[in-house]
Amino acid sequence: GLGDVYKRQGMGLDKRIGSRFLRAGPAYGGSCFPKDTKAIISTADKFKTNLSVVKSVIKSNENRSKILLDRIYQMLNKKVKNKKITFLGVTFKANTDDMRDSSSLKMIPWLSKKGAIIKYFDPTGYKNEFSKLKNVTNKTSIKDAVQNSDLVILHTEWNDFKSINFKN
């Protein structure tokens, strides 16, 4: 069969869909989509209509952080404590400072509680959300964020991250 990239490109050719929202990411978030999908379900329930596809989308999105945390856990050989983990981007999507329902709000606290040493860089300079967490540091540059990391997570697809040279 076709690979995911080709499927995405094909679907994106349809102007009603477009390609902008067909890229893989940690989960959807923000102020609109989570609220809107829940409102659709609420309205459907009032009219006794089962929208199983929308319910599945919500459930799948809620599970994304757990799935990604499990992958991180496996990549680090089930040893998260004292591992240096960098998040590049913490907002729910690029080109915004919106943190609402960002999967980083679930992932970073969980990793911090497990003893990981978290560094993050976001082009917005965002730093308030994690300031009270142990072992979580906001960095002011990509280089400072990724230096000496055991694992780098590209969380948000900012253009700033497209040309990173990890060799330097």
Model regions and ranges:
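Structural/interface elements that position substrates and couple domains in central-metabolism enzymes
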Residues: 1-168
